[in-house]
């Protein structure tokens, strides 16, 4: 049966849902005043203990004066003890931002800037079989040669925590419509390769956007990165 609306004014639905240690789920999303897509933007969190039928009253978990945090991507640390949340800075006045929680999302650290290489929009990532993180997003790093295109960052969780650049970034797909791409889906396939899916205008001409998948393995991109050095 169709459930009634939650009544949470927002720009878009949850951009991240993560399972908590007690089996409940934490949903994160962003909004502006009145739920509209205008500054100042803030990130909110809500919980469900019944599989999504009901949700708690949302609480603001991230906001910064002069910055517009949005599109949270939340994931768990390799040891399972910490939640990490990557956020877009919507005005592109700064790098992206990141915050951490060690109490299952009840409280969060103050948002801080990510490394330059993780600066962008619409982050989504997976853990590769070797334990490294592969995070895909629309590149918006200042002075980046791949600004506006679909890229992936490869590195460790410790790199993110310490503000290190990680192993490398790689351009996955070229956008022929400016920076109009992203909102990726990411899957690790049974053979260990990674499937990244995005909407993108992948070739010039009259054709408009398509939904495109690109498949790669960290071993393959490692070789490409080494060859580029």
Explain the meaning of each model-derived region:
Residues 1-229:
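Asp-box/BNR beta-propeller blade signature and adjacent active/binding-site loops
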């Amino acid at each position: 049966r169709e459930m009634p609306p939650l009544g949470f004014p927002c720009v878009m639905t949850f951009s991240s849902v993560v399972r908590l240690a007690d089996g409940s789920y934490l949903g994160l999303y962003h909004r502006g005043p009145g739920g509209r897509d205008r500054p100042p933007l803030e990130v909110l969190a809500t919980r469900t203990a019944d599989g999504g039928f009901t949700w708690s009253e949302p609480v603001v978990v991230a906001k910064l004066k002069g910055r517009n945090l949005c599109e949270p991507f939340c994931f768990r640390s390799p040891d399972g003890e910490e939640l990490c949340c990557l956020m877009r800075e919507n005005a592109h006045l700064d790098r992206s931002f990141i915050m951490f929680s060690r109490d299952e999302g009840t409280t969060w650290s103050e948002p801080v800037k990510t490394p330059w290489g993780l600066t962008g929009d619409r982050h989504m990532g997976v853990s590769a079989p070797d334990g490294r993180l592969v995070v895909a997003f629309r590149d918006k790093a200042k002075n980046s040669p791949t600004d506006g295109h679909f890229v992936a960052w490869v590195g460790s969780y410790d790199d993110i925590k310490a503000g290190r650049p990680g192993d490398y970034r790689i351009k996955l797909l070229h956008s022929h419509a400016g920076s109009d791409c992203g909102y990726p889906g990411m899957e690790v396939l049974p053979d260990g390769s990674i499937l990244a899916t995005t909407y993108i205008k992948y070739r010039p001409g009259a054709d408009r956007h398509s939904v495109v998948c690109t498949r790669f393995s960290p071993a393959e991109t490692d070789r490409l990165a080494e060859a580029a050095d």
